[in-house]
């Protein structure tokens, strides 16, 4: 390492080069996390329901978690989204428009015992899924 009176430029350049050894720095600067994200960095996304699927819970739990396979409108990517609430999947039909958000797992991954599911449904045809499950709102007729 340079230590002299006029060493600032060399020190700056060395720091700049060394930062690229940090993987999180490289991914952030190159925008790789946003590029790999189906929602493209947005907090929520809209999509069309393709099918209803049941995902088996991981051990030691034994359940079939009700999910839907959706195609995002903004980029055409397909993702699986969890339907939270008792009987929530009954309010969702194929070709409905749903709003999804991240499920909140660590490092952007899956949460709890639902493997490979990184999103959850929040609204169906612009009506809150939670309100429909409670019974406060009805699903709008199209």
From Swiss-Prot:
Give GO terms for biological process. translation
Q: Which domain of life is it from?
A: Archaea
Alphabetized, the UniProt keywords read: Ribonucleoprotein, Ribosomal protein, RNA-binding, rRNA-binding
Q: Name one Pfam family in it.
A: Ribosom_S12_S23
Q: Where is the signal peptide?
A: none
Cellular component GO terms held in the UniProt record: small ribosomal subunit
**SUPFAM superfamilies from the entry?**
Nucleic acid-binding proteins
Record-linked InterPro entries: NA-bd_OB-fold, Ribosomal_uS12, Ribosomal_uS12_arc, Ribosomal_uS12_euk/arc
Q: Does the keyword Translocase apply?
A: no
CDD domains on file: Ribosomal_S23 (cd03367)
The molecular function terms in GO held by this entry are:
rRNA binding; structural constituent of ribosome
| Family in the record | Belongs to the universal ribosomal protein uS12 family.
Oligomer status and interactors: Part of the 30S ribosomal subunit.
Q: What does this protein do?
A: With S4 and S5 plays an important role in translational accuracy. Located at the interface of the 30S and 50S subunits.
Q: What is this protein called?
A: Small ribosomal subunit protein uS12
Recorded source organism is Methanosarcina barkeri (strain Fusaro / DSM 804)
């Amino acid at each position: 390492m340079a230590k002299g009176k006029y060493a600032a430029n060399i020190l700056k350049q060395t720091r700049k080069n060394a930062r690229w050894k940090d993987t999180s720095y490289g991914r952030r600067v190159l925008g790789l996390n946003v590029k790999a994200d189906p929602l493209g960095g947005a907090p929520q996304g809209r999509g069309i329901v393709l099918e209803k699927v049941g995902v088996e819970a991981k051990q030691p739990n034994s359940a079939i978690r009700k999910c839907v396979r959706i195609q995002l409108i903004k980029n055409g990517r397909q993702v699986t989204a969890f339907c939270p609430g008792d009987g929530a999947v009954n309010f969702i039909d194929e070709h409905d428009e749903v709003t999804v958000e991240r499920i909140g797992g660590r490092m952007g991954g899956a949460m709890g015992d639902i493997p490979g599911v990184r999103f959850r449904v929040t609204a169906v045809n612009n009506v809150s899924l939670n309100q429909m499950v409670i019974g406060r709102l009805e699903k709008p007729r199209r």
